Amino acid sequence: MCISISQVSRLRIHSFGSSCCERVHGWIKNSSSLKLLDVRASSVDGKARWIRRNVSTTTQGSRSNTKSSVLGGTVPVTRIIDEESRTKVQPFGNLQQRLAQDKDLSKLLTVIVSDLETTGLHRKNERIIEIAAQDIAGGGYSTFQTLVNPGVVPITNAHIHGIRNDMVCRPEVPRMEELIPIFLRYVESRQKPGGYVMLVAHNGKSFDFQFLINEFNRCSYEIPHNWLLLDSLPLARENMKSVEPTVKLSSSLEALADYYSLTREGDAHRALSDVLLLSKVFQKLTIDLKLSLSDLVLRCHTASDISAAMAKNKKA
DNA sequence: GGCCCTCTTTAGGGCCTT
């Protein structure tokens, strides 16, 4: 079951509530960010009406016959996915059991795996064009995915992810300043009362977290102080080194998926596909390295740590 | 950019992220 925010609005929110889990229903029903989407939709033709915000991936020319077929032709701009209903399985059972055994931290911590697609590799000049995240505990409405409108910044690496300017530079695709409060609401909906969030990304310290911090700063937001940032790449390197000390095995997400014989859903270098894969890889890594939740917390960074390093580098 | 490795440490190349 896959629910897009635009579909929620189209269906009338109050009648939709009974089918949602309570937390997500609560923030959707009361969300000011949803009003933002409505205003934006209304501004397209000056009429106040709900619209479905889909972006067609059907393309003409060099790319994407393959991609379009894989993605099913269209994808919603922003959506929260009921992964539990979609997969009919508990994909992270082992980690859930381990979290449950850690009685103190498991009551406080929400682990969310994330991935970004961007207009390029430069941390300062490029922009985010797609975000996906998944609460590793699974359950209903645990997954978030959205395209992001980068404004005037051109996409020069569409050959990597297949996302082109004409797909995201559209009025119905939210800009980052509109999206941040929506993303914050999603994270809050997964958060335990008075708890902390561990955001996991592959090569996050050098890439994803720097992009997020820059975008939050640009839009006059701060990364919440109860967020911990965990880079899964050092875990992968440590694990692969322990597997084969004399030969340097690749620690890329793709190589890890091959090593663990994991199947990818969707296309590589699309945020949701990478998040679903990293969620599985992350679980395998924590098991192989015998890392407790406490161990993981000790390996986390804070946004202020990374911001300070970025500022130091900027001066240098 | 940050990290790791080595033919290193007063450095440089490769990996990983898009």
Swiss-Prot record:
Mg(2+) 1 binds at D115, E117, D274. GO terms for molecular function: 3'-5' exonuclease activity; exonuclease activity; metal ion binding; nucleic acid binding. The active site is at H269 (proton donor/acceptor). Keywords: Chloroplast, Exonuclease, Hydrolase, Magnesium, Metal-binding, Mitochondrion, Nuclease, Plastid, Transit peptide. Its cofactor is Mg(2+). It is found in: Plastid, Chloroplast; Mitochondrion. Residues 112-282 form the Exonuclease domain. The keyword Magnesium applies. Mg(2+) 2 binds at D115. Residues 1-63 form a transit peptide. Its EC number is 3.1.11.-. It comes from the Eukaryota. Exonuclease required for organelle DNA degradation during pollen development. Plays non-essential roles in maternal inheritance. May be part of the DNA salvage machinery. Belongs to the exonuclease superfamily. TREX family. DPD1 homologs are present in flowering plants but not in moss, green algae and animals. This is Exonuclease DPD1, chloroplastic/mitochondrial.
